[in-house]
Amino acid sequence: MEKELKVITIDELKKYIRNNEEDKIEEVDVVTSATCGIMSGTAGIFHIPFNEVFKRAEEIYLNDIKGVVGICPNEFLGKVDAIFYGEVGFLFKDLVKGKVVEAKAISEGKIYKNEITIDDLPTAKMIGTRMAFKNYTAITNLSDEEVNTIFHRLPLKKGEASFSGCGMLNPLENMVIKDEKDVVGKKALLNGAEAIILGFGTRASIEKPNLMMSADMKDMDAYYLGGFVTSNGIEIYNTIAVPIKVDEHKEALKKLDKDITLPLVNIFGREIIDIGSYAEVWENVDLRPKIYQDKCKNCRECLVEKYCPTFAIKRENGKIKITEDCFGCGVCNICPYGVFKTKLGSVCGIPITCRQSDRKRALKLAKELKKKIERGEFKI
């Protein structure tokens, strides 16, 4: 008879460490770790049907977002293999939600259109070329000029910082990896869907690994992915959970946020200015904003509603509502009347004004993976 695995989430394990209960780790077989954040290296591979036959597509669009026509020509079939990447975060979320999107192909000067949902796509796979980074950096601006950047919703000003990385929750931070073969073929959850790790992602190294992985978008949960507007374009966020066998990675699993460095770099040139730790940005902070409705002036143009990077702030009948699309980035602190308040911490003395990783989503997916393993729905 197969042994029943003792499974706990990564935050449960870290509580053992903080409470000096390391002996309890000996009773655990598997820990479910997770991370959530902006992951630019995300693409969708689709097989898109049309109602009319054409020779071959020269251009392809979904909701007017241009894709790349794929390798297979599908000559005279009225079907297009396509790859979409770049500013696709909101598009992918809509697809996973089952919303109708407009497909448009151009062939020999003629336009062909079709309204489709993800169920109409025989193939809808996500591939991440650079995911689940072993944490990242904090970015600041040493110049006197504001700069538009993918690292902040607003132009990054002198004296403020943004950061990415879920610290001690991150899967790669909790694993001992000596070779790419240590991760090839392992299973994970990508936005709730069972995924396969293909190996290291682009620009990966043993010291700074990241993962290349793939999953079926039809099995994903829209809560875990989406678009994130920055001051230099639209990015995409994903959520990843990875099971870790305790006996293989025991020492790495003992790290806390205070043990994980967070380099602070200048946006120009990326030179390291100072080195802090993830404890500075994840301890004693808020994962979601607090709302003080009584302070709201019902401004004609609400800055928070306008600049929320995930469009999670809504005003209904004079009341403010935060939807589940909230990423906990903290940008809503810009409200001049203090309606929103999110404690974000600081790094090396510089206040954080934008987070690009979300521990709330990461922890939720870690719990989901734990339940799947316990129910026998996810085999290790």
UniProtKB/Swiss-Prot annotation:
Residues 287-318 form the 4Fe-4S ferredoxin-type domain. It comes from the Archaea. Transmembrane segments: none annotated. Keywords: 4Fe-4S, Iron, Iron-sulfur, Metal-binding. InterPro entries: 4Fe4S_Fe-S-bd, Fe-S_Ferredoxin, HcyBio, Methan_mark_16. GO terms for molecular function: 4 iron, 4 sulfur cluster binding; metal ion binding. Pfam families: HcyBio. NCBIfam families: methan_mark_16 (TIGR03287). This is Uncharacterized protein MJ1681. It comes from Methanocaldococcus jannaschii (strain ATCC 43067 / DSM 2661 / JAL-1 / JCM 10045 / NBRC 100440).
